[in-house]
């Protein structure tokens, strides 16, 4: 059988286990949870409901796994856990896709016959800076974009999902999407083993009358609280059509939204360029920037010499003149930046002017260090993005630095464009932002690192930009201005507002990418009338901050992201005229958009099962017996706000509403909301605002925790269907099994940085899990056969039990902190490792493992691994015959960790590692010293130091005092060296002092203050003696002697170099041996003669140990005893008695001593008597009764 087939067989076996366990959970309704009356603590965990235009992929699963693992752990903590899971259908993409399918059938027939010579759409280049620092408050406009691959037509996209033409036809009805994908997603999630209460699942939009009613109630409340206003908002707009251009109206640019810039006004100073000299109004070159916080570092501005610019009148009174491209001028005219909406009034004769005619213009740049800067040429500027005017900040923009460097280095280039040296040479990059690892001139540093010599090195410059912009925007700290010391991300919006208030800048918005309407018009961004949530209102911001203050965010980056978003968040359009969703109650021409109906829906989960159980579209009345039209605004207010019952406004019996309110009051608030980090800048912050608005005084309903995670990479590459590096949840389970996939998701990562799902890790997980199951089955067989030891008193046993306690406690802390990668590390990888070590220790002393400890390990391993790998854990739990389900079991109880025992365990482990290294060195001496091959040693001496030598104790005292004086930290080596130099007693140890200090500092980093103790905290000799058999077997030694460094006659060098907890082992020359035959005379026993080398002075126990090592037939469990012949001369020649094989023998005690004389006669001394042995003794090997 091939390796691949063997691996698939393991996966198939795991999948069989998973299927049977899922059926068990289903039959027991394991994850259905209802409000309790007994005071049992609860835990509500939720995940942003996925959008229903496709199957779930591994990225969804990664974020959802954080909720899933938390749910599993909290169940073990004895809480009633609810993990509900809904499905989002609100918004434009589903409707747009359905309409596309309709058009494709109209245009190309059914099934569509698409033209073969279709020219592929040209992909627009996406700048690194655009992706890194664009407005994070905007939601993802199309959730299908990332999943379409290279398909051009919607029909082809649907084909790529494995659908046939007949099936695809159904998707031209947008409602079909709502009924097709949710059941598939539920099936996939059930195969994953998700601990969801599926009774509470629902879909959004007005298709679901209950949820529709809930959203209308929410928006009526928000409007009554004056949180919703009507006014002009930035929208993609078609001037030709005279209306907003939504996705379904676009020939290209689906999913593209508005991108906001700060329009920096660089005033043209005298003397003006000849072409502009006749203009009396103030003239401004207007540059669109995404980073207003960098304006302190302006050294010039750039124009493209060959681009055609336009000079036009700006502002309502036309007292200012702007210079920009005609394209951007057209956009500005729809944003209130010209006198008449939609019309550009050009300066006569300057409708077009080449950039070269404006070069050299003197400018006043807002916030710049230089009073006067100049317009210089840059050849990489494009006229289809921004305004064609680029403000230059060479300290933090690699492009700007490269272009400025070209001009400085190339005089002919300056002369070509009529630039004087004074316009270029005096201007140096200005340090304005400090970035860790890049310094305060980040662009200069990156250009130096990448050896960028010219503005034409596009690839290198793109790499440099990505590094500088990413670190600069998120980690940069301002060095100048009134916001010095603050993070750049925190001051971006504030500086934009300051510049606007002072008339030095204004807001400018254009499409993120080119958008063409179906009428053939290039769209702009225009200010259009819309309903919007006024997140910029000061009072509402303050309330949102109060919600955020006690919130658990699990890491500081998430808190900072939420704080920053709350600070700069402004008005957000909550209405759309196209798509699916709930209609605005007071203006039904509009729909509530997708990021606005999904802010407090977690409250709806608490009652969904009573209203619509069994039908996620709400088409069937649920157990509460309440019809959708009975859930009036007043009814919802009774349930969620506790308003007094009023039968006039609440057309439903109060008892029914009470049942709903009971569920809400028990489950709310959310204990943890987990999501991808991309939702920090929108959904997660909107959640804070809306909870503050709906429950303004009831803080008990505010969310308790928000956890964000990074994106998921697949084999260290971005997931992308177009490149084939993509995997759905269904595919992952099929390839790796559910638990194999789950383990790999846990191992992928926890923070806001991108995590990595690695196929090799998933394959290894399958093998680990399969091997673990087989080992557990083997242990059950050994237990049933009585092959495991009954006691648990040996050193290895005590250490194993102690290490289990330690790792169980550490794993609990990791789960509590939602650090699931660490929980997997301590609760599986390290937990398995201590089992392996224990198994090795037991084998090293020829003893079986302890039955009680082995099964303590198995049970606790299943418990602490169950949140991550619940199927296998449940399977083993049932295999062990445990009561109930493991998903309902309590977290294992542990005894306090015995720190001294832990130190002793490390002492043995580290000592043995050092001893093995010594043996290797002993057996492979350096070639120069090699005169003959060393003899394999059989004896050794271990030297143990109870405390450090006096000079080292003096240094330790110095270090301990310094640690106390410096809040537990040690000073640098220079300071320590000065302190040591002052000690008279240490002067003769000057050369040894600092190496010793360095060793102690390294230990200090690992162990803390305990590394500074001057004596051993444990009895090293006792621990070594208890493990002497293990040490001898590991090193293949016959005899080991333990000596203390304070004994007389110890070599001075050994005394000097041996320190507490680091014993020294020296091998001693081998003593003469003589061979003694040990013969087994037991009847019907497969034991044979064993030739044993005897050393003068060997005890019986030593000889037995040698025999065990020599003969594998003498099993660890056998009890071995030695017997001498009564007649040493004739004993081994006599017939053996069948009835009593040992009638001619006398048993030796363990303390008896073997000797041999000069004539090689072997004898044994027992007490005061001495007996000749001849060359043969007898041994008995019995399996002890349990």
Swiss-Prot record:
Q: Which reaction does it catalyse?
A: tRNA(Leu) + L-leucine + ATP = L-leucyl-tRNA(Leu) + AMP + diphosphate
Alphabetical keyword list: Aminoacyl-tRNA synthetase, ATP-binding, Ligase, Nucleotide-binding, Protein biosynthesis
- Which residues participate in ATP binding? 721
User: What Enzyme Commission number(s) does the record list for this chain?
Assistant: 6.1.1.4
Residue span of motif 'HIGH' region: 50-60
One GO molecular-function entry? ATP binding
Any Gene Ontology biological process = translation
Q: Which domain of life is it from?
A: Eukaryota
Q: Give the record's family classification.
A: Belongs to the class-I aminoacyl-tRNA synthetase family.
Designated name of the protein: Leucine--tRNA ligase
Q: Which organism is it from?
A: Caenorhabditis elegans
Q: What gene name does this entry carry?
A: lars-1
């Amino acid at each position: 059988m091939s390796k691949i087939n063997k691996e698939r067989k393991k996966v198939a076996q795991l999948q069989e286990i998973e299927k049977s366990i899922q059926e068990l959970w289903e039959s027991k309704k394991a994850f259905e949870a209802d409000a309790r009356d007994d005071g049992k603590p609860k835990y509500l965990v939720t995940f942003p409901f996925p959008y229903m235009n496709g199957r779930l992929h591994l990225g969804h699963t990664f974020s959802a796994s954080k909720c899933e693992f938390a749910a599993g752990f909290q169940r073990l903590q004895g809480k009633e856990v609810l993990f509900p899971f809904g499905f989002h259908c609100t918004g434009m993409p589903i409707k747009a896709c359905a309409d596309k399918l309709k058009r494709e059938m109209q245009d190309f027939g059914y099934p569509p016959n698409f033209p073969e010579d279709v020219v592929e759409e040209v992909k627009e280049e996406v700048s690194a800076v655009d992706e890194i620092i664009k407005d994070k408050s905007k939601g993802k406009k199309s959730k299908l974009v990332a999943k379409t691959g290279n398909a051009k037509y919607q029909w082809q996209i649907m084909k790529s999902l494995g659908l046939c033409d007949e099936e695809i036809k159904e998707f031209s009805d947008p409602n079909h999407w709502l009924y097709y994908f949710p059941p598939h997603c539920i099936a996939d999630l059930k195969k994953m083993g998700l601990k969801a209460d599926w009774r509470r699942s629902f879909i959004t939009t007005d298709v679901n009358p209950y949820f529709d009613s809930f959203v209308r109630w929410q928006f009526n409340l928000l409007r009554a609280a004056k949180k919703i206003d009507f006014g002009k908002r930035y929208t993609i707009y078609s001037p030709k059509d005279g209306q907003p251009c939504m996705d379904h109206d676009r020939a290209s640019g689906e999913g593209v939204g508005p991108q906001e810039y700060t329009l920096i006004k660089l005033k043209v100073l005298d003397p003006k360029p000849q072409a502009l000299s006749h203009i009396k109004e103030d003239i401004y070159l207007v540059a669109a920037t995404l980073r207003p916080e960098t304006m302190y570092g302006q050294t010039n501005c750039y124009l493209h010499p060959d681009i055609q610019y336009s000079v036009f009148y700006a502002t309502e009174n036309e007292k200012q003149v702007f210079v920009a491209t005609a394209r951007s001028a057209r956009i500005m005219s729809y944003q209130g930046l010209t006198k008449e909406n939609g019309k550009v009034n050009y300066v006569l004769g300057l409708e077009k002017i080449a950039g070269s005619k404006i070069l050299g213009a003197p400018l006043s740049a807002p916030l710049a260090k230089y009073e006067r800067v100049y317009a210089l040429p840059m050849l990489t500027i494009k006229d289809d993005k921004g305004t064609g005017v680029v403000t230059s900040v060479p300290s933090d923009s690699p492009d700007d630095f490269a272009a400025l460097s070209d001009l400085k280095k190339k005089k002919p280039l300056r002369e070509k464009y009529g630039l004087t040296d004074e316009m270029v040479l005096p201007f140096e990059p200005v340090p304005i932002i400090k970035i860790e690892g890049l310094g305060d001139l980040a662009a200069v540093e990156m250009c130096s690192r990448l050896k960028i010599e010219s503005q034409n090195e596009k690839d290198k410059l793109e790499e440099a930009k990505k590094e500088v912009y990413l670190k600069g925007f998120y980690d940069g700290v301002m060095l100048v201005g009134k916001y010095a010391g603050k993070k750049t991300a925190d001051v971006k919006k504030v500086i934009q507002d300051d510049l606007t208030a002072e008339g030095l800048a204004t807001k400018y918005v254009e499409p993120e990418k080119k958008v063409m309407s179906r009428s053939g018009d290039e769209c702009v961004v225009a200010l259009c009338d819309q309903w919007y949530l006024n997140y910029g209102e000061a009072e509402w911001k303050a309330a949102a901050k109060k919600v955020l203050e006690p919130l658990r965010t699990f890491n500081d980056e998430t808190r900072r992201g939420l704080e920053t978003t709350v600070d700069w968040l402004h008005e957000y359009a909550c209405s759309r005229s196209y798509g699916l969703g709930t209609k605005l109650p007071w203006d039904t021409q509009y729909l509530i958009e997708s990021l606005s109906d999904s802010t407090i829906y977690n409250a709806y989960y608490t009652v969904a099962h009573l209203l619509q159980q069994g039908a996620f579209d709400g088409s069937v009345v649920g157990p509460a017996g309440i019809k959708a039209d009975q859930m009036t605004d007043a009814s919802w207010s009774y349930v969620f706000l506790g308003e007094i019952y009023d039968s006039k406004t609440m057309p439903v019996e109060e008892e029914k509403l009470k049942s709903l309110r009971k569920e809400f009051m028990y489950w709310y608030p959310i204990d943890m909301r987990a999501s991808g980090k991309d939702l920090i800048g929108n959904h997660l912050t909107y959640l804070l605002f809306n909870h503050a608005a709906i429950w303004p005084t009831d803080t008990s309903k505010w969310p308790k925790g928000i956890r964000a995670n990074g994106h998921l990479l697949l084999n260290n590459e971005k997931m992308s269907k177009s490149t084939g590096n993509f995997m759905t949840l269904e595919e992952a389970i099929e390839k790796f099994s559910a638990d194999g996939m789950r383990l790999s998701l846990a191992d992928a990562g926890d923070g806001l940085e991108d995590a990595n799902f690695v196929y090799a890790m998933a394959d290894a997980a399958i093998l680990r899990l399969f091997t673990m199951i087989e080992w557990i089955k083997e242990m059950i067989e050994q237990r049933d056969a009585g092959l495991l030891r009954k006691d648990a008193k040996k050193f290895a046993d005590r250490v194993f039990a102690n290490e289990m306690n330690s790792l169980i406690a550490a794993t609990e802390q990791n789960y509590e902190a939602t650090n699931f990668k660490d929980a997997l590390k301590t609760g599986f990888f390290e937990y398995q490792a201590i089992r392996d070590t224990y198994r090795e220790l037991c084998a090293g002393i020829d003893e079986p493992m302890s039955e009680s400890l082995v099964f303590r390990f198995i049970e606790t391993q299943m418990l602490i691994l169950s949140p991550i790998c619940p199927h296998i854990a449940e399977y083993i739990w049932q295999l062990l015959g445990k009561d109930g389900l493991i998903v309902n079991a309590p977290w294992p109880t542990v005894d306090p960790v015995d720190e001294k025992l832990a130190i002793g365990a490390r002492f043995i482990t580290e000592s043995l590692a050092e001893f093995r290294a010594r043996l290797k060195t002993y057996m492979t001496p350096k070639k120069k010293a090699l005169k003959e091959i060393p003899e394999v040693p059989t004896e050794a001496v271990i030297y143990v130091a109870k405390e450090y030598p006096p000079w080292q104790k003096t240094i330790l005292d110095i270090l301990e005092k310094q640690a106390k004086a410096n809040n537990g930290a040690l000073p640098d080596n220079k300071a320590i060296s000065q302190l040591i130099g002052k000690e008279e007693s240490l002067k003769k140890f000057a050369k040894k002092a600092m190496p010793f200090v360095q060793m102690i500092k390294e230990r200090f980093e690992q162990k803390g203050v305990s590394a500074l103790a001057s004596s051993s905290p444990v009895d090293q000799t006792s621990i070594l003696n208890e493990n002497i058999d293990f040490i001898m077997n590991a090193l293949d030694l016959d005899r080991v002697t333990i000596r203390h460094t304070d004994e007389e006659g110890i070599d001075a060098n050994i005394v000097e170099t041996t320190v507490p907890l680091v014993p020294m082992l020296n091998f001693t020359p081998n003593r003469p041996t003589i061979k003694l035959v040990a013969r087994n005379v037991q009847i019907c026993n497969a034991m044979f003669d064993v030739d044993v080398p005897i050393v003068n002075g060997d005890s019986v126990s030593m000889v037995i140990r040698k025999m065990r090592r020599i003969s594998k037939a003498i099993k660890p469990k056998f009890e071995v005893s030695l017997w001498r012949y009564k007649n040493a001369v004739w004993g081994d020649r006599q017939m053996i008695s069948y009835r009593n094989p040992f009638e001619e023998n006398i048993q030796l005690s363990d303390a008896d001593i073997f000797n041999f004389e000069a004539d090689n006669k072997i004898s044994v001394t027992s007490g005061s008597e001495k007996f000749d042995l001849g060359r043969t003794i007898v041994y008995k090997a019995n399996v002890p009764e349990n």
